[in-house]
Amino acid sequence: VTRLSYSAIALYDRCSYRFYAERVAGMRPAPWRRDGGGEAAGALHPTELGDAVHRLLERVDLTAPAAPPGEELAQVVRGWYPAVTDDDLSRIGVFVEAYCDSELARRVSALPGVRPERPFAFEVDGVLVNGRLDVLWHDGERALVLDYKTNALLGRDPAEIVDEEYQTQRAVYALACLRAGATEAEVVYQFLEAPEAVVTTTFAVADVARLEEALSASIARIRGGEFRPTPSPFACSGCPALDVVCAGPRLGGSPPGAAALELAALG
């Protein structure tokens, strides 16, 4: 392994078995059914909806944030996703407005030189780690990274979700800034369902060794070929192995290696 995206590392940490299914075995999720009836009929897949929101926010002027008019938004999104429904468009518009009308957006608008969708790359243990940042501000000594989330909170606290599901991503974002010369890196998560409940963590140069150690441990496990299912609603959603070679949440007390043996047998 010589190159990994932060999303690949995060996927491995979330469920190494799903990582194997997607990144090693080459399994692909089943196509999203748009004709299943009920409320989901014709609806965008959650990842498509999230992509539309992120692409629209990338077009927003961060120094004077304003959501596009409804007709303009609909025309743009239909160009990307012709199957989008009116309900989808309404949800997308609400998410974009949630950022533009938030206190965080006002704070970001005052940061000179703030830019959307910035690439990054750095090396750890001979592996190039790369990815993109939704929003980056860097003035030399200080840096701020903003990551938008369109996840459904389902009553959960945003800080709890970040701690449980985005630790690796947060560490990678902080390292990207600190490795680029910042002495302080603030990583901010904004769940657009609750735009004022931002989750902010600040890292300093003194944290670099700890962050690198955690990232190195993940890379070492990937290199070591440890692939075991760790089912959860978040990890299993959309997994191509689910109900094919893995029982997912139904695994219960199954031996840790049982699903791995089943997948290996398909090779």
Question: Language model features by range: what are they?
Answer:
Residues 23, 27, 52-63, 76-80, ...:
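Generic, well-ordered alpha-helical scaffold segments in large soluble proteins
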Residues 1-67, 143:
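C-terminal RecA-like lobe
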Residues 112-118, 129-133, 232:
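Short beta-strand or tight-loop elements
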Residues 55-59, 99-106, 139, 159-190, ...:
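Metal-dependent nuclease catalytic cores in nucleic-acid-processing enzymes
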Residues 35-125, 266:
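A non-catalytic, helix-rich entry segment at domain boundaries
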